[in-house]
Swiss-Prot record:
N-acetylalanine carried by residues: 2
Name the UniProt record assigns to this protein: Inositol-phosphate phosphatase
Catalytic activity: a myo-inositol phosphate + H2O = myo-inositol + phosphate; beta-L-galactose 1-phosphate + H2O = L-galactose + phosphate
SUPFAM superfamilies assigned: Carbohydrate phosphatase
Gene: VTC4
GO molecular function, one term: metal ion binding
Regulation: Inhibited by LiCl or CaCl(2). Not inhibited by ascorbate.
Enzyme Commission identifier(s): 3.1.3.25, 3.1.3.93
Species of the source: Arabidopsis thaliana
Amino acid sequence: MADNDSLDQFLAAAIDAAKKAGQIIRKGFYETKHVEHKGQVDLVTETDKGCEELVFNHLKQLFPNHKFIGEETTAAFGVTELTDEPTWIVDPLDGTTNFVHGFPFVCVSIGLTIGKVPVVGVVYNPIMEELFTGVQGKGAFLNGKRIKVSAQSELLTALLVTEAGTKRDKATLDDTTNRINSLLTKVRSLRMSGSCALDLCGVACGRVDIFYELGFGGPWDIAAGIVIVKEAGGLIFDPSGKDLDITSQRIAASNASLKELFAEALRLTGA
């Protein structure tokens, strides 16, 4: 495991890369977009590709021996295996559909894993000027101010956030809507922001109490947010209530009081 000085160095590099990528996102947000389809509703823009190239080039110059996993390179060349080596896991533009529509929940997400464990996380929304950071053992912050998860202890008064994903086959849609219908009877209300990384940050700073998603894109959606939630005092787990597998495309997050209550509610939906 890296020492504290190394973690601070990694964090500083990730923040620098995120802010540079943020400039590209901010510029592109207000311009006409060139949009390509990765699936029926899954989109990619030149901004996604440009940001990933910028972030990787910046970090590779500083840490040439580290490994790299990114959403767009993975989409083009296939899944890169996560090893124990220091690995930067990057979503250059989480919330691409939001970006295309001019909805300001967009961000760059940069996480670093060592021994397959996320230890540094940076999530930056350049439209709303919010920089979320977390380092293992050092706390989580929003624009430099320490954040923590909510103290909510009852499901019925909890605010839940989730996402509908990009699959539109009938079986998946039926499962998704049936699950949401069931959960809406157990929580105060439900939100969808369109960004997995920002949903995790929402749990970390107490804006929402619970997050879950089944079938998101890959580890780049969650690597940074995992650190930020944990360092804010929250729990990250598989929606079944078991330990998270970062490569499983299943995740849930909450405070300690709500974890078992929510996991049981999800189990009753068949998740």
